Regions:
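C-terminal catalytic domain of Rieske-type non-heme iron oxygenases
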Residues: 86, 91-277
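Rieske [2Fe-2S] iron-sulfur-binding domain
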Residues: 1-98, 102-112
Length: 277
């Protein structure tokens, strides 16, 4: 998997040993991008399209073209430049600049007990995996608004019909936040809400409370996880220029999703997309 972020290029790959590693998506020779596709499968090696340097899937240099014209190259020193990487419940995070801050999995550890019942290890992406949307607003404005539920009654008729007054935000120290929308006791005014409540097939591993709520976990500065009884999403914002933002996210379903849960996931998506114009 590759992606670009504000001038940086990242590559995440699983080696033959099954281990996941992250690298800068550039050749150690001249900085050319070694993988052009967004996602795919590398059979055994990665070859730079510029000068033909070849790398093993663990990032080490396998060989350079015309080796007789070059000095002996250490396979680690001249391998793909590594990135700091961390994994939390199957979600992979990379850090372009090493820092003293703790690993994200340590920061999010306070949510582990609650999140464990969602069995995130059983998720698989829907559709093409990731989606992007361009927004004509500064990324900080997008994030500031999304971080508070004060706007929900006016801006999100679907969520307001689903939750009623049962939505609250819980700021947590360390750049974290937790927001919960518990289902209102009524049947619902909107078609999608009425049928979602009627047909909802929640994940069996969830307790009674989490079978009837949507849980959001926010991570400063730009990441949100949405954990629903029928599916899981994430989304984040990246600045492009002043007044323009790219929002990127992913939608996930459970691997053993049956027809009822698929319908529930479809309805929850409809509810989530209902916004005031």
């Amino acid at each position: 998997v590759t992606w670009n972020l504000i001038g940086e290029r990242a590559l995440v790959i699983r080696g033959k040993d099954g281990k996941i590693r992250a690298f800068h998506n550039l050749c150690k020779h001249r900085g050319s991008r070694v993988i052009a596709d967004d996602a795919g499968t590398c059979k055994s090696t990665i070859t730079c399209p510029f000068h033909g340097w070849t790398y093993n899937l663990d990032g080490t240099l396998r060989g350079a073209s015309r080796p007789s014209s070059l000095p002996k190259l250490d396979p680690i020193e001249y391998g793909l430049p590594p990135l700091e990487m961390d994994i939390w419940n199957g979600f992979i995070f990379v850090r372009f600049q090493p820092g003293p801050q703790p690993a994200l999995s340590d920061i999010l550890k306070k949510f582990d007990n609650e999140v464990s019942q969602y069995e995130l290890f059983d998720l698989e992406p829907t559709g093409d995996g990731f989606w992007t949307e361009e927004i004509d607003a500064n990324w900080k404005c997008v994030r500031d608004v999304d971080n508070e539920g004060y706007h929900v009654p006016m801006a999100h008729p679907g969520l307001h019909d689903l939750f009623g007054q049962n939505y609250y935000d819980e700021p947590i120290a360390g750049g974290l936040s937790r927001s919960v929308g518990s289902f209102d006791s009524g049947d619902g005014r909107l078609w999608s809400v009425r049928n979602y409540k009627k047909l909802l097939h929640a994940k069996d591993s969830l307790d009674e409370t989490h079978q009837k709520c949507w849980l959001y976990i926010g991570v400063f500065p730009n990441l949100v996880f949405g954990l629903y009884p029928d599916s899981v999403i994430f989304y984040q914002e990246y600045p492009v220029e002043n007044g323009k933002t790219i929002q990127r996210g992913g939608n996930y379903k459970y691997s053993k999703e049956d027809r009822e849960m698929k319908i529930s996931r479809y309805l929850s998506m409809r509810i989530d997309r209902l916004t005031s114009k």
